[in-house]
Amino acid sequence: MKDSAEFQEKKDLRKKRLQGKAIKNVGILWPYLLIPIHLITLKPLLFYLKTVIIDFFLLQFKVKWGWKKTSIAQVTDVIDEGIPFLPEKSDIYLDFINFWIRSLNFTVLRLGRKKALPHLAGFMAAIGTAYHEAARVYKIRMSTTPRPAVGKNKNMQTIHRLDPHLLCVPSLHVGVVVLTHTFFTAVFRQEGLSQEEQEQYSTELWEGAVEIAETVLYVKQHSVNCIPAALYMMTHLLKDQFTIQDAINFIDCLFVDTSHISAEQGKVIRNHIHYMFDRLLLEGCNEDDWIVPVLRWLMSQPVTEV
């Protein structure tokens, strides 16, 4: 009884400490301290890092440095021309990694280290799988879009220096933020957080995911064609957790509340993403592998030989 009382007291204290705080304000420390030193989390971490290094960075730089010859699909759309280039939004774009690391950190602070570890391991396994699955497309057909000159914006200079910009479809930025919202919403529900907490944190992650998804277009790192492919991928990787209806709801939230484009242009963007998402669904319904309709579309696009 004493142990049970102490456990409940610690649980209540953790909840009290986080009361009123947003996930974006809790920092990023604990994942860096915990994940590398526990076998349960180290194994998926190593798989994730290996995939990022080999199947994301090295895959692109081999082409950039002339070590590999390939065809690169040009996946831009005329709709992209109506979306302004906003380098000042690069902070949001670059926050993509901390977006999920903060969610891991919050999970540790809210649940305690012991209870959080399986969830940390689960997320690292899931994000590693997302990168691995996207790389199956990248290895067959790379894709790119035109990028404007970055000027004096330091963030954009860093982005252009570190990202050769050859792996646009599907967008991992979009896939991972969708994964983050879906995964941690399920964790909060599974661990019995109050309804008020669940709504607060799930809403925060949803809005953050939408904001980052919009930003990939504002900083010209992706095309409107990259987003539906990512959402289609996640409906397969997350199965019943991220449904077709969830993807539709996500699209419906894009470019709704913004002063940077007109309401009419926002509607045009959403309609196109809906169209492409529906097309992938219809073409993929009789396929055994989700990458088939994505590759079919990529193979139909004009290419640059490098």
Q: Where are each of the predicted segments found?
A:
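Hydrophobic alpha-helical bundle signature of multipass membrane enzymes
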Residues: 7-167, 176-214
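Alpha-helical transmembrane segments that form the membrane-embedded catalytic/substrate-binding core
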Residues: 176-180, 211-214, 218-245
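Functional transmembrane or membrane-interface alpha-helices that line membrane-embedded catalytic
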Residues: 193-202, 231, 236-260
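Charged/polar, low-hydrophobicity segments characteristic of intrinsically disordered regions
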Residues: 136-142, 217-231, 270-275
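Non-catalytic, membrane-anchoring transmembrane segments at the edges
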Residues: 6-12, 16-17, 45-46, 233, ...
